[in-house]
Amino acid sequence: MDADKDNIKQACDERSAEMDDMRGEQSMGLVHEIMSENKELDEEIKKLEAELQSDAREFQIKENVPEKKLKLTSVESPKDGCHFSNSSCSFQVSSQILYELQEGQALITFEKEEVAQNVISMGNHVVQMEGTPVKVSAHPVPLNTGVRFQVHVDISKMKINVTGIPDELSEEQTRDKLELSFCKSRNGGGEVESVDYDRKSRSAVITFVETGVVDKILKKKTYPLYMNQKCHSVAVSPCIERCLEKYQVFSAVSKKTVLLTGLEGIPVDEETGEDLLNIHFQRKNNGGGEVEVVKCSLDQSFAAYFKEEARETI
């Protein structure tokens, strides 16, 4: 009888030990699983932080902006709020003007316009080239026509472009699915005002009711679109409108640059010729002044490009 009791007690002790071992193994397994999940979450957090930094860099503009003094005279209160629905900018674009410098010619640019005009008015000049007097003639630089225009850019704060839309449903059903997907706040969406869907290009322009929704959506380049019990990834981008205005064609004569002719066959190379012309036209007693740059063309022709700092003739 006592032996039976001892056997039962021993069996209970062994069972208890087995249970303790099982609990320990389960605990270790649970700890390992939690650690593995934490590691995956840490990697996901790092990935999301990298994406946020990348998106932030895309919206940054690195440019040294000169200081400006501003005087605020009044505060406008637009009634319809349209002034705050777009980010706008405008700038003027002017084409560079090409001039082909032929052999035996040189271009010389002075710091001051009046010096260049004086050199031209004198007509002929005698320049010493390694002991050889060379007669050169000064002329205005005849430039070809150029163009200028203004570019206006409006970036909407209320609209986005959506591309890569699956062509699985009718146009009306697709518009409904777009509206339903982009109104989900958990994905960064908001109340949709309208959906302009183009089936041919598989794209759409979506207009939202509230400001701020577009900024949240554009933090990522894609957005989930739910259609036919599937989740598709569509591309989202800013809605940008561009407009060209005040297109003008003009011809001009450079104000600070002078064309010199008569340099064919001079007994020096181009670099030496440029130095000698620079020295000659630096001197005031030769009708010159401070020189910015000289370019000679003795052996081959060159292409020179002028920016719009010239006087318009038409």
From Swiss-Prot:
One annotated GO molecular function? identical protein binding
Residues with Phosphoserine modification: 16
* Gene3D superfamilies in the cross-refs: 3.30.70.330
Main location as per UniProt: cytoplasm
Sorted alphabetically, the Gene Ontology cellular component annotations on this record are: cytoplasm; cytosol; extracellular space; membrane; nucleoplasm; nucleus
Any one of the GO BP annotations:
macrophage activation involved in immune response
Q: Which InterPro entries does UniProt cross-reference here?
A: Nmi/IFP35_dom, Nmi/IFP35_N, Nucleotide-bd_a/b_plait_sf
Q: Which UniProt keywords apply?
A: Coiled coil, Cytoplasm, Immunity, Innate immunity, Isopeptide bond, Nucleus, Phosphoprotein, Secreted, Ubl conjugation
What tissues harbor this protein? Expressed in macrophages.
Inducers of expression: Induced by Sendai virus.
NID domain residues are 104-193, 202-293
**Coiled-coil features, chain-numbered ranges:** 31-65
What segment(s) does the record annotate as region Disordered?
1-24
Protein localization: Cytoplasm; Nucleus; Secreted
List the Pfam families hit by this protein, alphabetically.
IFP_35_N, NID
Could you say which protein family the record assigns here? Belongs to the NMI family.
| Free-text note on domains in this protein's UniProt record | The coiled-coil domain may be necessary for interaction with TRIM21 and for TRIM21-mediated ubiquitination of NMI.
Subunit composition and interactions: Interacts with MYCN and MYC, as well as with other transcription factors with a Zip, HLH or a HLH-Zip motif. Interacts with all STAT proteins except STAT2. Interacts with IRF7, the interaction is direct and leads to the inhibition of IRF7-mediated type I IFN production. Interacts (via coiled-coil domain) with TRIM21 (via the SPRY domain); the interaction leads to 'Lys-63'-linked ubiquitination of NMI. Interacts with IFI35; the interaction is direct and is facilitated by TRIM21. Interacts with TLR4; the interaction is direct and leads to NF-kappa-B activation.
**Cross-referenced PANTHER family, in alphabetical order?**
INTERFERON-INDUCED PROTEIN 35/NMI N-MYC/STAT INTERACTING PROTEIN, N-MYC-INTERACTOR
- Protein known as: N-myc-interactor
Protein source organism: Mus musculus (Mouse)
Q: What gene is this protein a product of?
A: Nmi
